[in-house]
Amino acid sequence: FAAVSVDCSEYPKPACTLEYVPICGSDNKTYGNKCNFCNAVVESNGTLTLSHFGKC
């Protein structure tokens, strides 16, 4: 079983595209794309993690 992860090393970014590729975070919130998710991960000081790809 491989752990799902997202590489957020190039974030945070000042602006995200409107591309819709939903990611479900460990906070049970659906993020619109990797950029939005990674920005939130950075803001949470790493406490937010990936639950799964797709809507929560």
From Swiss-Prot:
SS bond list: C8-C38, C16-C35, C24-C56
Keyword Repeat: yes
Record-level Gene Ontology MF annotations: serine-type endopeptidase inhibitor activity
GO cellular component terms given for this protein: extracellular region
Pfam families reported in the protein's UniProt record: Kazal_1
Residue positions the entry lists as glycosylated: N45
Source species, domain of life: Eukaryota
Protein name: Ovomucoid
